[in-house]
Amino acid sequence: GVVENMSRSNVVLWAKGALEKGEHINVVDDQYRSPTYAMDLAKGCLSIVEKEQSGLFHLSGKDLMSIIELVYRVADYYGLDKSIINPIKSAVLNQAAKRPPYTGFDLSKAKEWLDYTPMSFEEGLDALTKELVTLN
């Protein structure tokens, strides 16, 4: 999702913005994530409360992908130049915190107990694009 004046962006908005400006970007190809649309996360949390559930529930997007794949898909979705995306390994980054290679979750409990149905990555991009239009 989009929040005006965020102190920190997310990978989708960062990649979109950089590619729109024609900036060459370095993107790790050895880390995997389940991108999560903020409204899906909020709906999942609300469902826990409404269904009076407790315990551990994994809530995330339903698509697991590498960060480089995510950025390529952003470029494809918005019709941006993928040739300026440079795949790199995590080891060459001097990240302040070590990142795990995989952070995907098993959503089966949330789907069964909460009727959790997160958007696909492209559905999330559709929703994000509508938010961006509304803000401008």
Regions from the PLM with identified roles:
Residues 44, 51-96, 136:
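Mid/C-terminal beta-alpha module of Rossmann-like enzyme folds, strongest
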Residues 27-32, 57-65, 113:
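Glycine-rich Rossmann NAD(P)(H)-binding loop
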Residues 39-47, 122, 126:
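Amphipathic alpha-helical segments that line or abut small-molecule/effector binding pockets
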